[in-house]
Curated annotation (Swiss-Prot):
Name of the protein this chain belongs to: Gamma-glutamyl phosphate reductase
Originating species: Salmonella paratyphi C (strain RKS4594)
Domain of life: Bacteria
Enzyme class (EC, first level): oxidoreductase
Gene (name only): proA
Keywords linked to the UniProt accession: Amino-acid biosynthesis, Cytoplasm, NADP, Oxidoreductase, Proline biosynthesis
Pfam families linked: Aldedh
């Protein structure tokens, strides 16, 4: 089954690569229109997925990721339209020039070909990834989690209907709707057809892909994100940033999971933090210093060492008091996932040092980690947030779904 999907996807990719920007945008507009027109069928499938997931004991954080509403689906359709407004990188001449030999050389941006994406309970990923791949002239094979298989199947049917209406092969966007996990292992070995693989899920999925895939893999999305409250931080705006980074949408990978507090500000800062977190319903997981300093009003539990490596994806926040900037940077290097980390400070020397020494995909000064997002960065919807350094890093927009080719123009030109 998968080999036939691969053959069809590869054939579709050749046709997509030849489309003009206008032709690709017309497809995306049609997809957005169909998502709204077929909203009832997608939401009906999603209700079944959510009910099944709840019966299976899925956490509230995961249920939030899984659930669609009319407003969320409308926002997804609007995101597709936003992709239409983005500049098409395909065909862009990156650089080039005339060589001494007389050969005119250019480096031109081209589609990757076929992209494979493995993801868990995030139905919006289906549309986000499909729209970005189509905009860049790539075919895509999707493998969502079993929790979303009804939603994904309904969504892909809508996308394929739009493709067909525009005279394009339905195989440009395909989904593996069989929940059999052995198919993941088979997909990882489809290097004959898939040019790049992107896993979006937990550490176990990423480890499996790194170890078993014969396809180039871009991993990311695991966000043990930190905020360091420096000794010179302005407490009121710092609390506002922390509330946003923790509570706006706790189930996302750019949510802060560990707060590092400079010891020189801890006595003044921790009580204010506790009050604010109590109002926000956040449970604090405090180290020994925090446990001794606080006795309410926020719910407070002792921090377990293994929780420093946790991606809670819930209203839980580790709080650790550190001696100085060195301690904060060392902690992030040991426990961070190179996703998003921030410093809250009034000392621009410390800010510069933090930015230079924290090796994460996104580093912030006096701002929330929640900004690590394709839409917020002006990239449109994102296919993933890469925490590695090759071939993309941070939110992966359109350019991350392209490669380049060298093209030489001669006039009977030969090498001397």
């Amino acid at each position: 089954m998968l080999e036939q999907m691969g053959i069809a996807a590869k054939a579709a990719s050749y046709k997509l690569a030849l489309l003009s920007s206008g032709e690709k945008n017309r497809v995306l507009e049609k997809i957005a229109d169909e998502l709204e027109a077929q909203m009832e069928s997608i939401l009906s499938a999603n209700v079944q997925d959510v009910e099944q997931a709840r019966a299976n004991g899925l956490s509230e954080a995961m249920l939030d990721r899984l659930a669609l509403t009319p407003a969320r689906l409308k926002a997804i359709a609007d995101d597709v339209r936003q992709v239409c407004n983005l500049a098409d990188p395909v065909g862009q001449v990156i650089d080039g020039g005339l060589l001494d030999s007389g050969l005119r050389l250019e480096r031109r941006r081209v589609p990757l070909g076929v992209v494979g994406v493995i993801y868990e309970a995030r139905p919006n990923v289906t549309v986000d990834v499909a729209s970005l791949c189509l905009k860049t002239g790539n075919a895509v094979i999707l493998r969502g989690g079993k929790e979303t298989h009804r939603t994904n199947a309904a969504t892909v049917r809508v996308i394929q209907k739009a493709l067909k209406a525009c005279g394009l092969p339905e195989a440009a966007v395909q989904a593996i709707d069989n929940p059999d996990r052995s198919l993941v292992n088979e997909m990882l070995r489809m290097d004959k057809y898939i040019d790049m693989l992107i896993p979006r899920g937990g550490a176990g999925l990423h480890k499996l892909c790194r170890e078993q895939s014969t396809i180039p893999v871009i991993t990311g999305g695991i966000g043990v994100c930190h905020i360091f409250v420096d000794s010179s931080a302005d407490i009121a705006p710092a609390l506002k940033i922390i509330v946003n980074a923790k509570t706006q949408r706790p189930s996302t990978c750019n949510t802060v999971e560990t707060l590092l507090v400079h010891q020189d500000i801890a006595e003044r800062f921790l009580p204010a933090l506790s009050k604010q977190m109590a109002e926000s319903g956040v449970t604090l997981h405090g180290d020994e210093t925090v446990m001794q300093a606080l006795h309410g009003p926020a719910k407070l539990v002792p921090l377990k060492p293994e929780e420093l490596d946790n991606e809670f994806l819930s209203l839980d926040l580790n709080v650790v008091v550190v001696e100085n900037m060195d301690g904060a940077i060392a902690h992030i290097r040991e426990h961070g996932t190179q996703h998003s980390d921030a410093i809250l400070t009034s000392d621009m020397h410390n800010a510069a040092r933090f930015v230079n020494e924290v090796d994460s995909a996104a580093v912030y000064v006096n701002a929330s980690t929640r900004f690590t997002d394709g839409g917020q960065f002006g990239l449109g919807a994102e296919v993933a947030v890469s925490t590695q350094k090759l071939h993309a890093r941070g939110p992966m927009g359109l350019e991350a779904l392209t490669t380049y080719k060298w093209i030489g123009f001669g006039d009977g030109t030969i090498r001397a």
